[in-house]
Amino acid sequence: MRIVFMGTPDFAVGSLQALCESGKHEILAVVTQPDRPKGRGNKLLQTPVKEYALAQGLTVYQPQKVKTPEFVELLHELQPELIVVAAFGQFLSKEILELPKYGCI
């Protein structure tokens, strides 16, 4: 199945890992929150989902807002059959929720 995965913290990595290891799905893209400065030096830190996705060679997108027309158009172009969301951190518009053939979970 053609899947777009949306998630950010450690909690979401397990779900992405299970999808990758199943060997039954094509992960079209991983969408996660933008890198944020943390710590004393305000060093930009990648999200746990981004770290895992890059290690797997997956395409990663980090939009400030997923509701922008540009990002919605990108999702249309990817043509996912399913969007899997795990602790993503942004509300998805009705248009995004209805875009995949099998919806969003």
Q: Where do the protein language model's features map onto the residues?
A:
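One-carbon transfer enzymes
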Residues: M1-I105
